[in-house]
Amino acid sequence: MSKDLISRLERQFKLKRDEFQDPLELLKFEKNLDYARKLLWEEGKCQLDKVAEPQGLSKRIMDLQGRIYDLNVTMEKKLKIEEKKIKSKQEKEIAHALQSIQERELRERQQMSNVEASNAQLLTNQRSMQTEISESLLHLASVLKENALSFTNALVTDNQVVERTGSLLDKNAHSLRHANHGVQSYSKSKRLSFWLQLGMIIAVVVSFIVMIFILQFTKNQN
């Protein structure tokens, strides 16, 4: 039974040697080889006089173990090389990542500095605008106060002018009424004198006609 297992392991090692590059496959093969050695001891076929036999099972097991050892050494070398490559790659990736982080932190600090500078400039501009607005409001309040005082003084002056104008208008109205009364009296007296003059003229004309009539009548009698 152990002989069949060893033969099968030898064929497997010869046919699938490339698959033993995988540590798991190689470990599985080693377990099978240990199991074959165990069977060999149990069957009592591991005597010392058979170790040197060319076709002895112990010799064949030792040969497989030597090959496995060589594979392990080769695999360890490859693993070390791969480990160095992976380590180098990881170091490069870590260095690149650290550089990227440093560059990003630098950009963020620069952006923060720019933002702080922009905020400071913005605050300065806002304070300047607030100062200008406050000064403008104070100036506007002063102008409004002056205009209010001027308007009040103008109202007082206008009231005085209105009062004086009203007094003058009252005086003028009284004078106009007096003048109107005089004009009316003058018109009445003028109309009377007109009729008187007209009457006198008529009387003179009538007297003249009467005189002419008398003179004519006197001539006719003579």
Swiss-Prot record:
Ribosomal protein recorded as keyword: no
Domain of life: Eukaryota
Molecular function terms from GO: SNAP receptor activity
Matching InterPro entries: Vesicle_transport_protein_Use1 (IPR019150)
Cysteines joined through disulfide linkages: none
Record keyword Endoplasmic reticulum present: yes
UniProt KW keywords: Endoplasmic reticulum, ER-Golgi transport, Membrane, Protein transport, Transmembrane, Transmembrane helix, Transport
Ranges of the Lumenal topological domain: 215-222
Main location: endoplasmic reticulum
Protein's GO biological process: intracellular protein transport; retrograde vesicle-mediated transport, Golgi to endoplasmic reticulum
Annotated compartments: Endoplasmic reticulum membrane
GO cellular component, one term: endoplasmic reticulum
TM annotation in the entry: 194-214
UniProt family annotation: Belongs to the USE1 family.
Subunit structure: Component of a SNARE complex consisting of ufe1, use1, sec20 and sec22 or ykt6.
Functional description taken from the UniProt entry: SNARE required for targeting and fusion of Golgi-derived retrograde transport vesicles with the ER.
Protein's recorded name: Protein transport protein use1
Organism of this sequence: Schizosaccharomyces pombe (strain 972 / ATCC 24843) (Fission yeast)
